Amino acid sequence: MRVVKRYSWLWVGLLLFLTASIAMLLLTSNQRPSFTTATWIWNAKLISSQTEEIVSFAKDNQINLIYLHIEPTRVSPQAYRAFIQKANEANIKVEALGGDPNWAYTANRQSIGDLVSWVKAYNQMAKVDEQFSGIHVDIEPYLLPDWKKDQEKVVNQWLKNVDYLITETKKDGKLQVSADLPFWIDTVTVPGDSEKVSNWMLQRLDSITLMAYRNHAMGHNGIVDIVEKTVAAANSAKKASVIVGVNILESSEGSNVSFHEEGTHEMKQQLVILQEELAENPAFAGSAIHDYESWKHATQREEQL
């Protein structure tokens, strides 16, 4: 009887162990993927001589997405291939970055077509681990003089060009399409409709990066305050589609739009608060820091103190 009793306890222990293991497995499988930490590299010439340095900085700061400017006349395809391969080794995705306020005009649609064509031709020639994972545009039509004169006309052409960008990009291949948008884009409506431009973009693009350039996460006019409506509106799609961007580039637009004075430590603290506040939103995908060079210079200044 002692033997039977002893083995019965072993079976009970084994059963408890298996139950706990299955529970942990289910819990792990239900957890959402890690958040995105992105940055912009506008001066693509840097990758020709600083690939190791950039990737090392990215790893140190948990960057897993880079928007890399396309400059075919200054940077060779070989340089792009070498950089993307190194980035992929570090589990960092790279999206092709392009854009100009004038790209909002349908008369300048060819510039969008040229970017898409270049990226597709590049990817066809590159190995899988050397390819761009998507196209990311920064158009900012509100910088045009016409935005104040005839906003409806500009918005109408802008949306047509975004439709064109998506159609051309998605014709073949699996490239993602994303865009930078101002945090206040939810106050602009589609011409002839009551739909918000923010919702229009979210329905069509794979993701958006909201330029929520503030240096505090909480409180009135803080980062959470100015993005939460757009994030909430995107939740119904049940996909991580909204990246929240902050700025560390020195700015003359005001004392609260950049972390240039506060520094990288304070910026990271505020981004932790941002993530904690928005983590339960399915649409919240992570954060982006503008831009790599400014972030790197700020880090170097702090290291010298």
Model-derived features: where do they sit?
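Substrate-binding cleft of secreted/luminal carbohydrate-active enzymes
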Residues: 236, 240-305
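Boundary/entry segment of secreted carbohydrate-active catalytic domains
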Residues: 24-61, 179-183, 249, 287-294
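Active-site groove signature of glycoside hydrolases
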Residues: 67, 119-155, 285-289
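Aromatic-lined carbohydrate-recognition surfaces of secreted/lumenal glycan-active proteins
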Residues: 95-102, 158-195, 239-250, 288
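Aromatic-lined substrate-binding rim segments of carbohydrate-active enzymes
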Residues: 65-100, 149-179
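Catalytic domains of carbohydrate-active enzymes, especially glycoside hydrolases
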Residues: 50-74, 128-131, 207
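Aromatic- and acid-rich polysaccharide-binding/catalytic face
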Residues: 63, 72, 194-224, 292
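Short, acidic/polar
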Residues: 44-59, 108-126, 189-201, 265-278
